[in-house]
Design a protein with these regions (language model features):
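Polybasic low-complexity intrinsically disordered regions
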Residues: 1-85, 89-102, 108
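Short, solvent-exposed polar/charged micro-motifs at secondary-structure junctions
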Residues: 8-14, 114-116, 157
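Structural motif
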Residues: 33-36, 149-158
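Hydrophobic (often cysteine-bearing) scaffold residues that line and stabilize catalytic clefts
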Residues: 65, 126, 155, 159
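A general structural signal for well-ordered alpha-helical segments in protein cores
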Residues: 66-69, 134, 160
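Helix-centered, glycine/charged polyanion-binding patches within enzymatic domains
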Residues: 80, 85-152
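C-terminal domain-tail junction helix/linker
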Residues: 156-189
């Protein structure tokens, strides 16, 4: 499943005084899910159905979700990728088909053709899993709390958070610990 989340580097009111990330391309963008404008970047992630993050990319905040998906498509072949409404469009579907990737994304209600109800429910169920993964990254691993002073430090910090998340998921599955998916650090820490 492919998904993206905002990564603000400064609070909105202090962003105009920011100098450290401006050279790296940090900019303003609106986040419709959080109903706020933020200054920073956007993280695109490719997540398995079990909840492991297999690939991620940090892009400018103003970059469309399609670009993050196209970068993932260059490195992966013969995949079935689930996405939300940000990954719809005939041009994107044709582009993914040419790379032998099946893209199944939720379509807005204005579309004439939509997936059957069972497929939409399946996509919603897997989307909840992805939202749990991102909430774990932001709440338990504090991924959205940026303490880095450079873009390289930001990337390193995010890599460590994602590695920690994947290790916690692996330990919980190896030891078959009865652990709620919302508390991945329960076994390790």
């Amino acid at each position: 499943m492919v998904y993206s989340f905002p990564l603000p580097v400064y609070k909105f009111g202090r962003a105009r005084f920011c100098r450290s990330f401006r050279a790296d391309g940090a900019n303003y963008e609106k986040c419709p899910s959080k109903k706020e404008t933020y200054y920073g970047f956007k993280v695109h992630a490719l997540i398995t159905l079990e909840g492991y993050i297999t690939a991620f990319k940090i892009t400018l905040a103003s970059i469309d979700d399609w670009e993050g998906l196209r970068d993932f498509a260059e490195n992966h072949l013969n995949l079935v990728i689930l996405g939300d409404k940000g990954y719809t469009g005939e041009q994107l579907l044709e582009d993914m088909r040419s790379k032998s990737i099946c893209l199944m994304s939720l379509k807005p209600s204005s579309y004439k053709t939509n997936w059957p109800k069972e497929v939409r429910q399946l996509i919603f169920r897997f989307r909840r899993r992805v939202e749990i993964v991102f909430s774990q990254l932001s709440e338990q691993m504090k991924a959205e709390r940026v303490l880095a002073k450079s873009f390289r430090g930001l990337c390193t910090r995010l890599q460590n958070k994602i590695l920690g998340h994947n290790l916690c998921m692996a330990f919980n599955s190896i030891f078959r610990e009865a652990c709620d998916i919302g508390r991945i650090k329960q076994l390790v820490f």
